[in-house]
């Protein structure tokens, strides 16, 4: 059993127990990576979320995150901006940090079921702990709304981190993936 499986089960159980209102479940898979994200609103326009990304791109790396975001979703756009704590457990080093970032998607006027956009988070060295110096996550996706509650997507993700014992930033994930997002 992979070492991240208990974390995945724990995050899922905590999230399921804490959400009585609408939320989302997002799962994506690539050749060398799997990611699961869960989110739930806590007030009008504010959502909390948690997730895990396990990548075997070059070395073994597991990243857990928790976030709070200001969010807005309507027929034209889907955006969120906020803070995210990311904890790294990698072959290069371990540590965590508080980053800022968000996501933004625009629905195409001539194809209203299709949206394009991306996301990014940056964690500077001033907001890190352990061996982590800084990290950067960026990605892009093309999404298709199969139903009002189900999106499918194709995306690209790149995550880098700089650790104390390394000479330069390390790429922890660099992958194309496919995924599904369920909203309930």
Question: What is the role of each PLM region?
Answer:
Residues 1-24:
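Cleavable N-terminal export/targeting peptides
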Residues 18-70:
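Short glycine/proline- and aromatic-enriched beta-strand/turn motifs that initiate or cap beta-hairpins
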Residues 29-33, 52-58, 70, 83-89, ...:
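Transmembrane beta-strands of outer-membrane beta-barrel pores
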Residues 30-34, 44, 58-64, 77, ...:
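Residues that define the transmembrane beta-barrel architecture of outer-membrane proteins
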Residues 37-41, 67-71, 103-107, 141-143, ...:
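Transmembrane beta-barrel domains of outer membrane proteins
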Residues 44-50, 73-79, 110-116, 144, ...:
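Repeated loop/turn-to-beta-strand initiation elements of outer-membrane beta-barrel proteins
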Residues 63-109, 116:
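Hydrophobic, well-structured mid-protein blocks that either form specific transmembrane helices
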Residues 144, 171-184:
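Outer-membrane beta-barrel "beta-signal"
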């Amino acid at each position: 059993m992979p070492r991240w499986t208990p974390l995945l089960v724990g995050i899922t159980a905590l999230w399921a127990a804490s959400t009585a209102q609408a939320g989302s479940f997002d799962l994506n898979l690539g050749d060398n990576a799997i990611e699961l994200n869960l989110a739930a609103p806590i007030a009008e326009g504010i959502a909390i979320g948690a997730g895990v990304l396990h990548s075997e791109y070059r070395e073994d790396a597991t990243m857990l995150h928790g976030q709070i975001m200001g969010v807005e979703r309507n027929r034209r756009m889907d955006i969120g901006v906020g803070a995210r704590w990311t904890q790294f457990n990698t072959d290069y080093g371990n540590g965590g940090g508080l980053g800022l970032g968000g996501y933004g998607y625009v629905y195409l006027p001539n194809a209203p079921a299709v949206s394009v956009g991306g996301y990014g988070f940056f964690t500077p060295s001033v907001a890190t702990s352990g061996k982590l110096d800084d990290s950067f996550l960026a990605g892009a996706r093309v999404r298709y709304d199969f139903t009002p509650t189900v999106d499918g997507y194709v995306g690209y993700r790149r995550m880098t981190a700089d650790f104390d014992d390394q000479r330069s930033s390390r790429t922890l994930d660099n992958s194309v993936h496919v995924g599904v997002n369920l909203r309930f």
